[in-house]
Amino acid sequence: MRKEYVMGNGAIALGALAAGLNLVAGYPGTPSSEILETVAKYPHDGVHVEWSVNEKAAMEVAASASYSGARTLVTMKQVGLNVASDPLMSLAYVGIKGGMVIVSADDPGPISSQTEQDTRMFADFCRIPVFDPSTPEEAYQMIQDAFDYSEKYKTPVLFRPTTRVCHAYASIEVKDEWKAKEYEGFVKDSKKWVIFPRLSFANHAMIEKRNVEIGDDFGDYSMNTVEGSGSKAVFASVSYTHLRAHETSQDL
């Protein structure tokens, strides 16, 4: 293990490599661009890295590899998820084989975007889990957990850092080397991968049952914490707002 001083986007990239990443595809846009660039910068034997022509194409490239059992990462900014929403909605019903994490970096403010849209609404809309880190350190660990949850429940997972997480710097402890996951390859199965209405109908019930199980699983997730005790005040917060709420609570 070694220490690396990296920005949040770098922590996300290194966490994905530590998780056994096989492929990353994305489309550039602040605040997400450095994630793919960091993967390309570090030694990445067995990892395919590509800038796609748009976010929709990146989503489809990653999904195709995931069907083979590969661990895949998609990167984009929040407005890019609008472009990628068509394959995402169907993908939520088809499911995946290898872990697939979709990083959609939100930009509250906005600082460098046309909108302040909230990626978490997409997660609720298409019925998939979402991870929401509040620091680069959390992002490094959470992205690894996201791959595990994705494979466990055979679903794509959304990962939603914000600008202040993406561009903050922190010292994190990382592995000395990474090894891409070994995977089986694509197995033809028309009853699994061809999304006809009959399959969608059956999968809808499966998704609702699965999400109850995921909710129970998330209830014990180590990153969901309760700090302090007493009845003076309660702050419920996520992402970067957690840090601001924590700072405010120190003044009470």
Model-predicted segments: where are they?
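Flexible, low-complexity linker and terminal segments
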Residues: 2-9, 133-244, 249-250
